[in-house]
Amino acid sequence: LASLKEVTGNIVIRNSYNGADLTGLDNIVSAGGLQVGSTDVASKATELHMISMKALETLSGDISVYNDQVTYVLFEKLATIEGSVMFNASSLQSFEFPVLTTVGQDLNLQGLNEENTAAGSIASLEIPELTSVGGALSVNNLAKLTSMSFLKLKETGGLDFHTVPVMLETINLPEIETVNGSIIMEANMEAPPTGSFVPQRNDVLQAFGGMDKLTTIKGQIKIKNFTALKQLPDWSKITTLGSITLDYLEDVSGTLLLPNARFETFGETAPQIEIINKVQLSKIE
C-alpha cells in the first residue's frame, strides 16, 4: 500500500484489522471516504487506537468512525471534507484537524459508551481553521470536556451542543455569523451533590466567547442549565431569527437586546421568546 496515493471509493477498516493505527495508508493524498464501524454495529477492531492519515488532503465523501478503542485522531493535512464527519469514540483523548477549513455536511463528535452514557477523557477541543460546516456542528456526550473553540467558524447548518458537561468552562465562537438552523446549548443535569436536593447543572461557564457577530439564525436559539452565566452574548446584529428559549440561567439579568431582529417561521420553529425557569431578565428590547 505504500505507493498508493489516491482512492476513489471508500476505505473500509474491517473488524479483522489488528493494527494499532493506519500506517499503511500514510501516503494517500485523496480518497472517497473512510469507514470504521457503523451506526448499527460498532467496529470490533480492538487494537485500533490511532486514526491518522498523514498525507491525506481531501475527501470527496464521509469519515465515519464508531470504535470504543480509538484514543487519538490526527489528520495533519486534511483541509476539505465534502461529505460528513461522524466520530463516536468513547475512549477519545485527542481530536486534531489542524488545517481543516470546510466540511460539506454534518460534523458530529460523540463519546457515548456501551452503557449509552457520556465518556472519553478529551478536555479541550479546537479546530482552529474551520470556517464552514454545511450541516450541523454537533459535539455531545464527552464527559471530561472543559473547552470548545472554533475560532474561525463563520457559517454552519446548526450548532448542537445539547449535552454540555457540567464542568465545561469555555465555548468560543468569535466569528460565527450565519446559522442555517438552530443553536442548542444545553448543559447536562447530574445527580445532586451530597447533602443537596438540587440537581447539578453547569456552574462554571460565565460567558460565551463571541457570538456577537451573529446576523442570521434560521431556527431557534436555546440556552439552558448554565447557572453561573453572567450575561448573554451581544445579539444586536441579529436580523433574522426563529425563536429564543432561555431556561435555568440564574445569574443572567438586565435587558435582552434584539433591536434589529425580525422573527420568522422556520419549519416547526414558531416565532417566540420563551423565558422559562430562573432567568432574571428585567426587559426585552
Regions found by a protein language model. Give the residues of each.
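Concave beta-strand-loop units of leucine-rich repeat
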Residues: V7-Y72, K77-Q93, V99, G104-S124, ...
